[in-house]
């Protein structure tokens, strides 16, 4: 006869074990090993008494379920697993990575406060900091967080939050989490780290002193490219405050189905990250010697400017790399046309390998929230443009062969594309000028 009693919570140190067991247990009614998917929007409330009031006011950190935007059993299971993987007290799962960033900032910042943030990070995040928070009366300093002195110099009496993304999207700058945590805490500020590119398998921000760690769960945590999600992990009291103030009021609730899909993906995260990292290193070495490539940036190469920090802070270098093409935009157009195993797409962390070209004039020069000095610093990493690569789970030799044939190819669009792009920019500039006049 099947024993359907609940097991005691899993206590393990290994990420591989936690990725499979944390937050999960056999269903107490059926014995099913796969966690159930709870798609209900509403739940039967407890009888009149303390539990009912807790469900309606969310006074406890795990109140009875009342409404799916406030909490859901599937999302709660995902939160337990993510908290265990990051070594945090609690986690809040949200609809997207940007919902996670927004929940953090709008919970802990108000008009008159000051935040220091990485000048290079995910586009949605840096645009939130550079464009939207100032409109709410929140002062923002965007700095190169790979230089702790810039963080220290940017501190103000009203600094409440330091926000770091490391490795930084898309240029792969690395920031010293431990050093910045010390700087932030001495000033009475919180430190939040977006660790999406590293995952808890390669980097543990909370253990290095961060207060909160953020992920776009859409990427590596899910791993299959089929579900949006985000998460913030940190102290239980702060996470509970975010749940009451940001999740309930701003509405970035994760779909239970997406939570279920991400939880499914997490079971293989340690294995996938090892494969991503191994293959990315092989591809980085190949590209580093290719005649069509002028520069490769990958944390696993000795040539990376922050290689010593990588060795001390990360257990492996991850699945993301960038490279510059000797042939510039024309070569990038040809590359996008001729790849076969790689897919030309902007996301990352999938089983399928992806790449995308970022022209510096479009993604850096046009950023109104960056100073001329900041743009010049970023150009030291990007040149006129970079190809960002998300190395998937295919065989590394097959991926190298695909890149090699595409890099050696020539195409008509690649020949005429740069001139057409320059003409389009002139037309857009003239149109903008006429609109201003």
Give residue spans per PLM region.
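N-terminal glycine-rich, Lys/His-bearing helix-loop that initiates the first secondary-structure elements
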Residues: 1-62, 415-416, 420-437
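PLP-dependent enzyme catalytic core of the Aspartate aminotransferase-like
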Residues: 2-3, 89, 130-131, 139-141, ...
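Conserved PLP-enzyme active-site core in the AAT-like
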Residues: 3-11, 19-21, 25-28, 90-290, ...
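C-terminal core of ALDH-fold dehydrogenases
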Residues: 12, 19-35, 330-371
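Glycine-rich beta-alpha junction loops
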Residues: 24-26, 39-45, 197, 219, ...
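Conserved N-terminal alpha-helix of the aminotransferase class I/II PLP-enzyme fold
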Residues: 42, 47-99, 124-131
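Short, well-ordered beta-strand elements within core beta-sheets of diverse protein domains
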Residues: 261-271, 318-326, 388-392
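Conserved small-domain helix->loop->beta segment predominantly found in fold-type I
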Residues: 281-354, 372-381, 418-425
């Amino acid at each position: 006869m099947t024993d359907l009693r609940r097991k005691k919570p899993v206590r393990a140190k290994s990420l591989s074990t936690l990725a499979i067991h944390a937050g999960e247990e056999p269903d107490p009614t059926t014995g099913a090993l796969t966690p159930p998917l709870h798609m209900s929007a509403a739940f039967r409330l407890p009888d009149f008494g303390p539990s009912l009031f807790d469900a309606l006011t969310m006074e406890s950190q795990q109140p009875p379920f009342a409404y799916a935007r406030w909490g859901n059993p599937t999302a709660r299971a995902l939160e337990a697993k993510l908290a265990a993987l990051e070594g945090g007290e609690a986690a809040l799962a949200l609809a997207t990575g940007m919902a996670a960033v927004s929940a953090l900032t709008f919970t802990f910042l108000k008009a008159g406060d000051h935040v220091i943030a990485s000048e290079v990070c995910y586009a949605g995040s840096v645009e939130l900091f550079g464009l939207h928070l100032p409109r709410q009366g929140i002062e923002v300093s965007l700095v190169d967080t790979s230089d702790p002195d810039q963080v220290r110099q940017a501190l103000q009496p009203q600094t409440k939050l330091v926000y770091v993304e490391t490795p930084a999207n898309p240029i792969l700058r690395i920031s010293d989490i431990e050093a910045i945590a010390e700087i932030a805490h001495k000033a009475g500020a919180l430190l939040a780290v977006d660790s999406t590119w590293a995952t808890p398998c390669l980097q543990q921000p909370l253990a290095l002193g961060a207060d909160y760690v953020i992920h776009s769960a859409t990427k590596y945590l899910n791993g299959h490219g089929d579900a949006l999600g985000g998460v913030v992990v940190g102290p239980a009291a702060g996470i509970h405050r975010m749940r009451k103030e940001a999740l309930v009021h701003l509405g970035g609730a994760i779909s239970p189905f997406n939570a279920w899909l991400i939880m499914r993906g997490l079971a293989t995260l340690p294995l996938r990250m090892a494969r991503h990292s191994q293959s990315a290193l092989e591809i980085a070495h190949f590209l580093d010697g290719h005649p069509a490539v002028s520069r490769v940036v990958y944390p696993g190469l000795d040539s990376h400017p922050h290689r010593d920090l990588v060795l001390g802070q990360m257990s492996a270098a991850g699945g993301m790399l960038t490279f510059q093409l000797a042939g510039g935009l024309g070569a990038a157009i040809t590359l996008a046309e001729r790849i076969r195993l790689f897919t030309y797409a902007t996301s990352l962390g999938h089983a399928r390998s992806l790449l995308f070209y970022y022209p510096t004039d479009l993604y850096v020069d046009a950023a109104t929230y960056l100073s001329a000095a900041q743009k010049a610093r970023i150009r030291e990493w990007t040149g006129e443009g970079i190809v960002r690569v998300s190395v998937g789970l295919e065989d590394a030799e097959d991926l190298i062969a695909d890149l090699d044939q595409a890099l050696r190819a020539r195409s008509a669009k690649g020949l005429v594309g740069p001139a057409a792009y320059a003409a389009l920019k002139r037309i857009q500039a003239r149109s903008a000028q006429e609109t201003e006049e």
